[in-house]
Design a protein with these regions (language model features):
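N-terminal alpha/beta PP-like core and its mobile active-site loop of ThDP/TPP-dependent enzymes
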Residues: 1-98
């Protein structure tokens, strides 16, 4: 019996494809652990991944990139650093609400 196998499409690749379809070209992150599957998906899609020294830096850089270029950007952090990214997310959200 001849079986053809198709490679499994992982969640990180699905996330990356969905965001790339929405125009995301840059991802700001503190690479490692939880984020790696998504980062692999973004790199496979040709998205530029910028590794940052801290989660808050990643958030502010994603916000600044979006303000300057008017293109969407992503801040991708793991659960252990989520609280560090909250100030940047709140600033981005507040600037849109003004």
């Amino acid at each position: 019996m001849n079986e053809t196998t198709t490679p499994k499409l992982r969640g990180g690749a699905l996330l990356a494809r969905a965001l790339v379809e929405k125009g995301v070209e840059h991802v700001f992150t503190l690479a490692g652990g939880f984020c790696n599957p998504a980062l692999e998906g973004f790199m496979d899609c040709g998205t530029r991944v910028i590794n940052c020294p801290h989660e808050q830096v990643a958030g502010h850089l994603a916000d600044a990139h979006t303000r300057i270029t008017r293109q969407p950007a992503v801040c991708l952090v793991g659960p252990e650093g989520f609280a560090n990214a909250v100030p940047a997310m709140m600033e981005a959200w507040a600037s849109v609400r003004r």
